[in-house]
Amino acid sequence: AGRGFGTFVSWFLLGGDIYTAYTFIAVPALVYAAGAAGFYALSYTIMVFPIVFVFAPRLWSVARARGYVSPGDFVRGRHGSQGLGLAVATTGILATMPYIALQLVGIESVLTVMGIGSPSGSAWARDLPLIIAFAVTAAYTYLAGLRAPALIAFVKDILIYLTVIVAIIYIPSRIGGWGHIFGVASAHLKTVNPATGKPYGSLVVMPAGEWAFATLALGSALALFVYPHAVTGVFAAKRRDVIRRNAALLPAYSLVLGLIALFGYMARAVPA
């Protein structure tokens, strides 16, 4: 990308990198299973952008001046240690592998809903569409570099916004409204989980869970922009003020994340 992405492209790129299949699958699933605990994701995406506003522009300036293009480059250059840079790069790869695996699970879920690679078929028939999708994505990214996810992000993010807006209006109108949704969710969360002997969760964070909620949200906020794909997106910005401007604009995605989390409650209210 040659550090040439402006505010508009960077907004879609960073938003697309951060809000992925995890957003659509894991967050609603946690809200579905445990209630308010799943909204930690909304809290940490609110906290992360002030951190980005303060530290990311300085990171970009040093990387641009020294020609760094990855977190490993940055650490190796700043600390003069090839081993430390290699350790950071290896840690980034290992930490990203589960993240990538979740994206593949998301793709598989979408293909299954579309009737492609049905679970009822053989393992090969089920996995072949996923392998093809991954190969196409990998080849496109290899050939086009960072421009590939940036271009895809335009289409993907627009579809996300449209899908969420339609779903948040249409689905409640079909299953009894928000009062019914929260009523059903609350009733389920109050029931006792046989495995733990405690309620499944609650609609609001209870005092006993406040520290767990807060530390999980804070730790996630501190870690989000340490992921290699997020740092690379920052490095691709054209100027320092592009990063600051995006730190101010990216919370729009947090609003959408909050609406997506509500899908978990909606799923609970859908008749079996």
Model-based region annotation:
Residues 39-141, 219-223, 232, 264, ...:
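Helix-loop-helix module between adjacent transmembrane segments
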Residues 23-30, 105-109:
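Membrane-embedded alpha-helical segments in integral membrane proteins
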